Every structure is written in C-alpha cells, then in structure tokens.
Amino acid sequence: MPKKVFCGTVTKAKCDKTVKVSVLQVYKDELYKKVIKKYKKYTAHDENNSCKEGDKVLIQEHKPISTTKKWVIVNSSH
C-alpha cells in the first residue's frame, strides 16, 4: 500500500526537529452543493531543522517516531 503524501504550510517550528504542518482539504458537500475548506494539522519530523514558519512542505506518512509524530518532511521549498 502506498504511503500518503500531503502538501501543506508550516505553522509552528519552535521545537527541536519537529514542525506543525497545516494541510488544506477541499471537498464538495453533495447535499448542500457547497464547497467546504477544512484545515488539518499534522506533527512532522524535520531532521535538519531546515523549515521555518510559512514554508511550503511535502509530508509523507512514516512509522511512528513519537506519540504524535507519524509524518516526515520529504521536500521543503522556501
């Protein structure tokens, strides 16, 4: 089974080797015919501490690193 990959924005980068990434998910409600935007936050592992707040990053599913970290940063574009 392929690993999930999401594109998001770094919202918090204060901890060591850890960043909080906000991912936008857009879907259409079939009943009300309305487009809904939903943000979900993921805790991701940043090995080199290279990400800053506001950076666009690609995160990929990974085996659990800690209690809440189950994602790893694959690509960071500044």
From Swiss-Prot:
GO terms for molecular function: rRNA binding; structural constituent of ribosome. The keyword Nucleus does not apply. It comes from Wolbachia sp. subsp. Drosophila simulans (strain wRi). PANTHER family: 40S RIBOSOMAL PROTEIN S11 FAMILY MEMBER, SMALL RIBOSOMAL SUBUNIT PROTEIN US17M. GO terms for biological process: translation. GO terms for cellular component: cytosolic small ribosomal subunit. InterPro entries: NA-bd_OB-fold, Ribosomal_uS17, Ribosomal_uS17_bact/chlr, Ribosomal_uS17_CS. Belongs to the universal ribosomal protein uS17 family. One of the primary rRNA binding proteins, it binds specifically to the 5'-end of 16S ribosomal RNA. Part of the 30S ribosomal subunit. It holds the Pfam family Ribosomal_S17. CDD domains: Ribosomal_uS17 (cd00364). This is Small ribosomal subunit protein uS17.
